[in-house]
Design a protein with these regions (language model features):
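Glycine-biased, small-residue-rich flexible motifs in mid-sequence functional cores and linkers
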Residues: 1-4, 73, 81-376
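Short, small/acidic-rich helices and loops at N termini and domain boundaries
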Residues: 1-85, 361-363, 368-370, 375-376
């Protein structure tokens, strides 16, 4: 632990000092300790408000920082500062990088691989969840680290897809690390910590304030070589992430959607505006920087199969009943078990055996209410 860690944490905790002001003060004074030692007049000349100056010159802020360090230890978390070697190189390049990153898990290990942000709507379709899980699973299995925001919908699906392939995933959250949001993602968060990292720029006890979530999006894109958008409405925060990615010189990818769906507006607009259309994992991998491809595959790109277009579904090793069910199911509209019983003209035991076999082969997924959907 660096000797001046409390100074960095304290500067990050001062109300009225965001990343832009903090970076300016550090460039002006050289270190957090020098900022705290500056005179009131000098700080006034920097344009700081009286209440911010008062907090900077109140010794209690350092007491709070030291208490924060004790809480970090209990949480098995760490803070990486802008001056630390462990600070992510790509993130350091962006405008207004966070001066301190709160981390649970192994961020360094997760970022040894090229990272891709996968984001989208919280209110997404079943198809969107299916696509997010499938693409994230395939990308993680080919060596990419999946970065998302731990939110409901597409974010959670992206994390789960990466975890299904035993891949690495990073959650960039809009709360302090002592708070899980949403609360039902506590188990998912712990799985991410065990297979990647959870990252925040906010002090430990920060609640899920609405303004925090668009604010953290620059970190989502800043950690990655590119951003993939899967379902986003016209006013979705995912479009903020895409804009930030463009500003940061990152690649922007999008999965096209149904033109009549509100959640397809974002990706369809981005594709029209020049984002790269994604249908399969290779569409992303082909855009990796050369050095990243060589690191992952030992060659410029992964070896191609005989056909460059792979079938999404293969009917190998399936029983006649399983094939029949797969033909009935779709990837976007769930089918209730009663509907399958009628459409398949199978008896109940045969239908249950077919569904069980398809689930074990990871070809379908059961949804709440005894409904089923085909996996991509």
């Amino acid at each position: 632990m660096r000797a001046d860690l409390a100074d960095w944490i304290a500067l990050n905790m001062v109300r009225g000092i965001g990343p832009r002001t903090a970076n300016h003060l550090l460039s002006r004074y050289g270190s957090p300790a020098s900022v705290f030692a500056a005179s009131r007049l000098a700080l006034q000349k920097e344009g700081l408000k009286p209440e911010t100056i008062q907090e900077l010159q109140d010794s209690s802020i350092l007491e709070k920082a030291n208490a924060e360090i004790e809480r970090l230890e209990k949480l098995n978390a760490q803070v990486i500062t802008l001056e630390d070697d462990e600070y992510p190189d790509l993130l350091r390049e962006i405008h207004d990088p966070p001066i301190a990153l709160y981390v649970r898990g192994d961020l360094q290990k997760a970022l040894e691989r090229p990272a891709l942000a996968v984001v989208g709507s919280r209110r997404c379709s079943t198809y969107g969840v299916n696509v997010a899980e499938s693409l994230s699973r395939d990308l993680a299995s080919h060596g990419l680290t999946i970065v998302s925001g731990l939110a409901r919908g597409i974010d959670a699906a992206a994390h789960r897809g990466a975890l299904e392939s035993s891949g690495q995933t990073i959650a960039v959250v809009g709360t302090g690390l002592e708070n899980t949001y949403p609360k039902e993602h506590k188990k998912l968060e712990e799985q991410i910590i065990a297979n990647g990292a959870v990252v925040s720029e906010f002090p430990l006890g920060t609640p899920p304030l609405p303004q925090n979530f668009p604010y953290r999006n620059r970190i989502l894109s800043g950690l990655c070589f590119g951003v993939l958008i899967i379902e986003a409405s016209e006013h979705s925060g995912s479009l903020i992430t895409a804009r930030l990615a463009y500003e940061q010189g990152r690649e922007v990818f999008a999965v096209p959607g149904n033109i009549t769906s509100q959640t397809s507006f974002g990706p369809n607009f981005l594709i029209k505006d020049g984002a790269k259309l994604v249908q399969i994992w290779r569409d992303v991998v082909d855009e990796l920087p050369r050095e990243a491809k060589e690191k992952l595959f030992g060659i410029e790109r992964p070896a191609a199969a005989k056909s460059s277009v792979q079938p999404i579904f293969e009917a190998v090793d399936l029983s006649d009943g399983e094939r029949k069910i797969l033909e009935i199911l779709s990837v976007d509209v769930p089918a209730h078990i009663d509907q399958l019983l009628i459409s398949s003209e199978m008896n109940s035991p045969d239908l249950m055996n077919a569904l069980l076999g398809l689930e074990m082969k990871d070809r379908i997924r059961q949804l709440p209410g005894k409904s089923f959907i085909k996996r991509i």
